Amino acid sequence: PSGMLHGNGKCIIGPGVVKEKKVLCPTSSGDHFLNLALEGATDITCFDINRLSKYYQELKITLIKRLDYSDFENILFSNDVYTCLITYFSNNDVQFKKYLKESVYEFWSNVVKQYEINSIMSHDVQVDAYWNNKYLLNEKNYYQLKNRLKTVKLRYLDCDIKNLNKITPEKYDYIFTSNIF
């Protein structure tokens, strides 16, 4: 489609391409959703066979809604992203219980209780991937996304791409099938 550039394995959505559009994308780390919301998509369905992706995306969305840019940046750009997330979650447990969906809160609460960093994730979890996301390039984009998250419609489908047509009859303006953004 016009307005989309491809190169070096990245997909960059040009201004206005997905504005007020219905979009389907992989849940993955949540960055597809966040970048599409920043670009103005208003109805986004995320799919992933890995249900853990949904929990991670929901945590990121909640952090963006609750934190200012520098605090969010300090967590995601730290040398040990996972430890920072766990620490922040455990220090702000009451707030998270209030803002996260119950199943998401229970998931992260259990992760904190059973926390053993080396057995769950490596210390450099996707740190380099964050530099490629438009919503993190500057404060203006971050706060614009934060504002758009108030109105974007989000749904999840727990399925593989091969089963999408069996799971949903929905039609979309744009469909992204890769988690490389």
Residue ranges, per PLM feature:
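Conserved S-adenosyl-L-methionine
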Residues: L38-I44, I49-R51
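Hydrophobic adenine-recognition pocket in adenosine-nucleotide-binding enzymes
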Residues: I180
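Conserved class I S-adenosyl-L-methionine
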Residues: E20-S29, I44-T45
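Short, conserved active-site loop motifs that form the nucleotide-linked donor/cofactor pocket
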Residues: V152-L154
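Class I S-adenosyl-L-methionine-dependent methyltransferase module
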Residues: I49-K150
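S-adenosyl-L-methionine
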Residues: P1-K19
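Conserved SAM-binding loop of SAM-dependent methyltransferases across substrates and taxa
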Residues: S29-A41
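A short acidic, Gly/Pro-enriched loop at the edge of an enzyme's catalytic core
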Residues: E20-K21, C159-F176
